[in-house]
A protein has these predicted regions:
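A generic structural motif
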Residues: 72-74, 223, 251-259, 331-334, ...
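Acidic/His- and Gly-rich active-site-bordering loop/insert found
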Residues: 2-115, 136-141
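Residue-level signal for inorganic ion chemistry
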Residues: 24, 28, 225, 276
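An extended, acidic, His-containing surface patch that forms the Zn2+-binding/catalytic region
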Residues: 65, 264-327, 333, 337-346, ...
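Acidic/histidine-rich catalytic neighborhood of metal-dependent amide-processing enzymes
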Residues: 120-201, 301-312, 458
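Short, conserved charged micro-motifs
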Residues: 204-205, 229-235, 341-348
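Active-site metal-coordination/substrate-binding segment of hydrolases
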Residues: 81-149, 154-155, 169-170, 426-427, ...
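Acidic-glycine-rich active-site phosphate/pyrophosphate-binding loop
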Residues: 94-107, 191-192, 196-200, 246-258, ...
C-alpha cells in the first residue's frame, strides 16, 4: 500500500510525540480524593496531568481552557465542532508489574509498557499530534476541533459531566473517543454500579477491605484469620484444589493471587476477593459465602439468570471490584454492564430476588447505540480503511465504556488494533510504537473527514 499524505507527514511528529508521552506517563494520575480540593477536584496527581496537557497544548499553538480543572480543553479553528475525547487519569497499579508503571519502558520488540500507554495517555498524545499535524497542513479550515482531556473517566466521567452541564459547553457536531478499538465501536453496554449487602457473622474477623476500583478484577487480596486450627494445611489444600488461584501464607496473612482484567470482561481474570470468600466458606462453614462465589465467579450472572443477550450484545457482565466486611455486614460493590434490552432497576430487582442480598443501585449510564449505516459511521470507516488498507475488520459492540456515551453523535475510534491485547487495567499495560505512530495519522484522517462532513451538513 502506497503511503498516504498523512502517513508521510506524520513521520516528523513521532519523536516529539513519544518524548511527551514519556513525560505524561511519568505523572501518577490515579484519582486521589484525599488530596482533592476546589482547584484539584480529582486530586493533585490528576491536576498535574491536566496542567501538563494544557502547557503542551499551548506550546503547540492550541487555545487552552482549564475548565475549572475538571478537564483540559485544547481547541483550533472555527465552525462546526468536532470533539476528540481522551482522559488523563489512569487506574491504580499493583505491585506485580515487571517494569516501573510510571515510566515508559520500550522492549526489543518496540512495545511500550507503562500505566496509561494504551488507556488513555498514548492514544491521547497520538491524537494531539495528529490534530497538530492537520493544523500545520492547513486542513482545519471551516471547522473547529476541541480536544478534551478528562480527569475522571476511570471513576465515573464526572469531568465530562461538568464540562457539558456545569460549564455549559455545547455538544459537538460529531465526536470520537480514541479510548477503544479500531475500526470503531458503534455500541457500548450500559454501565452501572450497585452494592450488595449481607448481614452475617464471620468468626475470627473484625473487618477487611478489598479493592480500589470497581472496573478492575481484584487480582490480589490479603486476609488475616484468627482462631483457625491447622490453617497452614487448610491453605495448602485450598491452593491445590483451586488451580486458577495461588493461595499461600506470608507474614501471618493468607495471600490470594488471581489475575487482573478489565471490569467489562471479568471472565478473563481471576477474582482473588471471591476466592477469599470461598476459602472462608469452607474453613468457617459459612454457606452464604460459597453462594456469593457461585453467583459472581463466572462474571456473566448465569447463576441468577442475569445475562440478557440482545441484538447487539452477547449478554451482561458483573465484576465485583470491592469487598468489605465491617460490623457484621459484608458488602460487595459490583460494576454491572447491561445490554440495551434491560434496565438497571429490573436487573437489580432480579439480583435481589435470586441472591437474597440487599441491593442498592448507586448510578450509571445507559447503553449507547449508533446506526452503523449512518454517514457519521461510514466516514470514520473510510478514514480507517484509507489509512490502513484493512477492509476486513468490522465495527464493534462492546462491554467497555468510553466518553462517547457522555456526549452526542460520538463513538469510540481506536486506538487498539484488531488482534492486539493492550492489557488495559492490568499489570504491564502495553502499546506498540508502531500502533502509537499509526494512530497519529489515523485519528487525524478521522477528524478531518468528520470536519468536512459537518461543513457539508451545515450548508
Amino acid at each position: 500500500m502506497k503511503k498516504t499524505i498523512l502517513q508521510e507527514a506524520s513521520i516528523k511528529y513521532r519523536e516529539e510525540a513519544l518524548a511527551n508521552l514519556k513525560k505524561f506517563v511519568a505523572i501518577n494520575t490515579v484519582m486521589d480524593l484525599k488530596s482533592a480540593s476546589e482547584s484539584s477536584p480529582f486530586g493533585t496527581g490528576v491536576r498535574q496531568g491536566l496542567d501538563f496537557v494544557a502547557d503542551l497544548g499551548r506550546k503547540l499553538g492550541f487555545n487552552v481552557d482549564y475548565c475549572s480543572h475538571y478537564v483540559t480543553e485544547l481547541s483550533l479553528g472555527t465552525g462546526p465542532v468536532i470533539d476528540v475525547y481522551c482522559h488523563a487519569d489512569v487506574v491504580p497499579v499493583s505491585k506485580n508489574w515487571k517494569t516501573d508503571p510510571f515510566k515508559v519502558t520500550i522492549d526489543s520488540n518496540n512495545k511500550m509498557y507503562g500505566r496509561g500507554v494504551s488507556d488513555d495517555k498514548g492514544p491521547g498524545m497520538a491524537s494531539l499530534y495528529g490534530i497538530k499535524m492537520l493544523s500545520d497542513l492547513g486542513y482545519i479550515n471551516g471547522y473547529k476541533v476541541r480536544m478534551i482531556f478528562g480527569g475522571n473517566e476511570e471513576n465515573g466521567s464526572a469531568g465530562l459531566e461538568a464540562y457539558f452541564h456545569k460549564l455549559k459547553k455545547g455538544y459537538p457536531s460529531y465526536g470520537i473517543s480514541p479510548d477503544g478499538d479500531y475500526p470503531l465501536i458503534y455500541a457500548e453496554k450500559g454501565i452501572f454500579t450497585y452494592k450488595a449487602s449481607y448481614d452475617l457473622f464471620i468468626p475470627g474477623l473484625t473487618n477487611f477491605h478489598f479493592g480500589q476500583a470497581t472496573n478492575i478484577v481484584l487480582d490480589e487480596v490479603k486476609l488475616k484469620l484468627n482462631g483457625v486450627t491447622d490453617l497452614e494445611a487448610k491453605v495448602a489444600k485450598f491452593d491445590m484444589e483451586n488451580a486458577d488461584i495461588r493461595v499461600f501464607l506470608a507474614e501471618g496473612e493468607i495471600v490470594f493471587k488471581g489475575k487482573a482484567a478489565h471490569g467489562s470482561i471479568p471472565w478473563e481474570g481471576v477474582n482473588a476477593g471471591l476466592y477469599a470468600l470461598k476459602f472462608m466458606s469452607e474453613v468457617l462453614n459459612i454457606p452464604v459465602l460459597e453462594n456469593i462465589f457461585n453467583d459472581y465467579n463466572d462474571g456473566r450472572g448465569t447463576a441468577f439468570d442475569g445475562n440478557y443477550p440482545s441484538k447487539y450484545f452477547d449478554g451482561a457482565s458483573y465484576n465485583i471490584g470491592k469487598i468489605s466486611y465491617e460490623d457484621g455486614k459484608l458488602t460487595l460493590v459490583c460494576n454491572m454492564r447491561l445490554p440495551e434490552n434491560v434496565g438497571p432497576e429490573e436487573a437489580c430487582t432480579n439480583i435481589a430476588n435470586k441472591t437474597k442480598a440487599k441491593i442498592e443501585l448507586i448510578g450509571g449510564s445507559p447503553a449507547l447505540i449508533n446506526d452503523p449505516k449512518s454517514a457519521f459511521i461510514q466516514e470514520l470507516l473510510k478514514a480507517y480503511v484509507e489509512q490502513t488498507g484493512d477492509t476486513e475488520s468490522k465495527p464493534l459492540a462492546i462491554g467497555g465504556g468510553t466518553y462517547a456515551r457522555d456526549s452526542k453523535n460520538s463513538v469510540a475510534f481506536g486506538c487498539t488494533f484488531p488482534g492486539r491485547d493492550p492489557k488495559m487495567h492490568q499489570d504491564d499495560e502495553v502499546f506498540s510504537l508502531e500502533d502509537f505512530y499509526a494512530s497519529i495519522y489515523i485519528v487525524a484522517a478521522a477528524v478531518d473527514k468528520l470536519g468536512k462532513l459537518a461543513i457539508r451538513e451545515s450548508k
